[in-house]
């Protein structure tokens, strides 16, 4: 028997074992997914659901979080601090702050709280004000010239030449101009019997005495003094202004003040608006009225964006074009200009637009506008330098998206998510829908194990949309998780998130007693929609079989569905696992131009592989061609 030659139909098989991440663009491939939630690249090249979170505590109001030797939470008007050391007790401070959103930054052992301008000390567990104000509207106070030790002197005589036969320690005012005997041109002298000489007493300070005047100030503070009336009295020509506090006690403080004025050698006493000047020997009195109120203030500028760099807090405001830096290691002094390396610093920038954020990266203090990056560098105020770069900066409302991961700064710009490594910012969000990254109302960033968490809020009211995107910086893959991130802060080894009701730890295994079932998230809800499958096949082939290999890591259930050529979803399989188990799910698809797969459920699963079997087409690829 002779059989005629017949053409064989050869099948080809391809196994996809390397999966990408979220790709919302037209270029989404079979290895990526076009939409999905709660998947991660933790088991790359496989695709796994994210790890369950652990609930740490419930709180319905949270205005900010920061981690420094422990977790500080601003809950309404309360401060709650939980130390990292489990043997230490949690601290709660009632009515410590005003109710409202906070900007927090750490320096040393302190966490600064703005706009309240407070500092929480993680060692003493106390809150203190950065600024301080004393006002003497009705107070009785005295201004008197004094020496470096704070001593105020009284003289028994004055004249153009020293008296004969003086006693040891005798004081005398040597007058240079008889018409102005009490002016700073005269010299206060003291006699020393041991040396037999008169020596000048330098009065280069002013002692300010009043009830409670020095309670909130300390040595080396720079305070702004106003309303003293000293210039009106002719005692000091420039006492009002910024003064350096040499020492302070409850009811007195000493400030640096150069001698100057026609009525310098005397005491100035104020009681309300009444002002009296009395010479050092009590022989001359002068009285007048001053409408000004004496005020002493340690000023702290209003700032919206803060960062720490080289033991200084740097800040700026969206309302002015000035960058501030505090005194070295002292966040309570912002206007200390003494010509030394520890001075405060301020610089005005000339770029247009408002500041939108601040951060520190690679040793630089960085300040952003929507179209500009300002970089400050140097070791001390005398050699600080400011450079500017026109580039895609931080979007308005996205100041908290700034986050440093592995020496690279990530942030949300008006054009998408950017990465800055010291040169030019580069865009890393090309796989995301750009329309969903624009016109953001607020953005918040966090970091954990090389992953960049980005919380986005767009719109308001019923039209408001909220997303939590996760970028794997090592692999360049995007994922999306369910929103649990209205507030975020990281400790380096953990990421804390607040969902509006409770605070969660992103990695439950890093918390103490993480196995407790009552605190672990129950069954992670997940969903994934693949990219179009089949678009890369030649016309002479069609998909004859698809096989998914999945692994359940814990108690899980899931459903697999398919959509042909953009049609309705058709359920292919439903599976349940009580523990770790592997599944092979094969199915024979209809002939179509392309198909998409949807995988959704609850639990912990890993997509290990997707095997495609293609066969030669006879009668056309599409179903309508066969018919």
List the predicted regions and their residue ranges:
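Conserved beta-strand position repeated once per blade in WD40 beta-propeller domains
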Residues: 64, 103-104, 305, 357, ...
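Small/polar beta-strand repeat architecture
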Residues: 4-8, 130-131, 182-187, 191-300
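Trp- and S/T/G-rich repeat-edge/linker motifs of beta-rich repeat architectures
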Residues: 39-59, 79-99, 121-152, 194-203, ...
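N-terminal beta-propeller domains
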Residues: 1-88, 142-149, 298-375, 456-470
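Beta-sheet repeat architectures centered on beta-propellers
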Residues: 2-70, 394-397, 407-408, 415, ...
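Short loop/turn segments that connect beta-strands within the blades of beta-propeller domains
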Residues: 68, 75-76, 107, 114-116, ...
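Short hydrophobic/aromatic-rich beta-strand motifs
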Residues: 71-72, 109-113, 163-190, 220-226, ...
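Short, surface-exposed terminal/edge motifs of secreted or surface/virion proteins that either
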Residues: 81, 117-133, 170-202, 234-237, ...
């Amino acid at each position: 028997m002779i059989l005629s030659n017949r053409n064989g139909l050869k099948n080809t098989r391809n196994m996809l074992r390397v999966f990408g991440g979220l790709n919302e663009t037209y270029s989404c491939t079979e290895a990526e997914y076009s939409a999905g939630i709660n998947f991660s690249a933790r088991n790359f090249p496989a695709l796994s659901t994210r790890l369950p979170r652990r609930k740490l505590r419930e709180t319905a109001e949270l205005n900010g979080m920061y981690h420094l030797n422990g977790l500080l939470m601003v809950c309404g008007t309360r401060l709650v601090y939980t130390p990292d050391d489990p043997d230490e007790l949690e601290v709660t401070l009632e009515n410590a702050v005003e109710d409202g959103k906070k900007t927090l930054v750490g320096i040393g052992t302190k966490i600064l709280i703005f706009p309240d301008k407070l500092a929480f000390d993680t060692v003493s567990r106390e809150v203190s004000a950065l600024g301080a104000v004393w006002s003497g509207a009705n107070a009785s106070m005295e201004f008197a010239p004094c020496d470096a030790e704070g001593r105020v002197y009284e003289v028994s005589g004055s004249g153009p030449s020293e008296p004969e036969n003086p006693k040891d320690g005798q004081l005398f005012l040597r007058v240079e101009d008889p018409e102005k005997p009490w002016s700073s041109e005269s010299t206060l002298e003291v006699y020393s019997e041991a040396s037999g000489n008169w020596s000048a007493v330098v009065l280069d300070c002013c002692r300010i005495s009043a009830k409670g005047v020095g309670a909130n100030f300390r040595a080396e503070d720079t305070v702004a003094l106003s309303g003293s009336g000293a210039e009106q009295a002719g005692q000091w020509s420039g006492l009002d202004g910024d003064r350096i506090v040499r020492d302070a006690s409850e009811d007195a403080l000493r400030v640096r003040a150069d001698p100057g004025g026609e009525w310098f050698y005397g005491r100035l006493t104020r009681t309300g608006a009444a002002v009296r000047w009395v010479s050092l020997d009590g022989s001359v009195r002068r009285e007048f009225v001053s409408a000004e109120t004496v005020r002493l203030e340690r000023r702290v500028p209003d700032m919206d964006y803060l960062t720490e760099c080289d033991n200084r807090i740097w800040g700026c405001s969206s309302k002015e074009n000035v960058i501030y830096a505090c005194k070295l290691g002292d966040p309570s002094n912002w206007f200390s200009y003494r010509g030394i390396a520890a001075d405060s610093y301020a610089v005005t920038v000339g770029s247009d637009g408002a500041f939108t954020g601040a951060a520190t990266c690679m040793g630089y203090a960085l300040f952003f506008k929507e179209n500009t990056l300002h970089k400050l560098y140097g070791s001390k105020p005398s050699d600080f330098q400011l450079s500017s770069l026109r580039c895609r900066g931080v979007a308005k409302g996205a100041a908290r998206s700034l986050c440093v991961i592995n020496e690279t700064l990530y942030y949300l710009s008006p054009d998408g998510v950017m990465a800055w490594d010291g040169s030019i910012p580069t865009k890393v969000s090309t796989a995301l829908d750009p329309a969903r990254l624009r016109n953001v109302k607020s953005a918040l960033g966090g970091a954990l194990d090389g992953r960049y968490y980005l919380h986005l809020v767009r719109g308001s009211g019923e039209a408001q949309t909220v997303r939590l995107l996760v970028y794997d910086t090592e692999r360049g893959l995007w994922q999306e998780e369910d929103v649990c991130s209205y507030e975020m802060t990281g400790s380096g080894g953990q990421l804390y998130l607040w969902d509006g009701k409770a605070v969660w730890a992103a990695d439950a295994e890093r918390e103490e007693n993480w196995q407790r079932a009552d605190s672990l998230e129950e069954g992670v809800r997940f969903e994934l929609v693949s990219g179009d499958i089949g678009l890369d096949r030649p016309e002479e082939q069609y998909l004859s079989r698809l096989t998914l290999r999945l692994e359940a890591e814990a108690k899980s259930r899931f459903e697999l569905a398919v959509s042909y050529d953009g049609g309705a979803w058709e359920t292919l399989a439903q599976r349940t696992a009580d523990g770790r188990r592997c599944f092979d799910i094969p199915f024979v698809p209809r002939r179509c131009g392309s198909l998409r797969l949807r995988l959704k459920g609850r639990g912990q699963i890993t997509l290990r592989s997707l095997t495609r079997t293609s066969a030669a087409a006879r009668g056309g690829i599409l179903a309508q061609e066969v018919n």
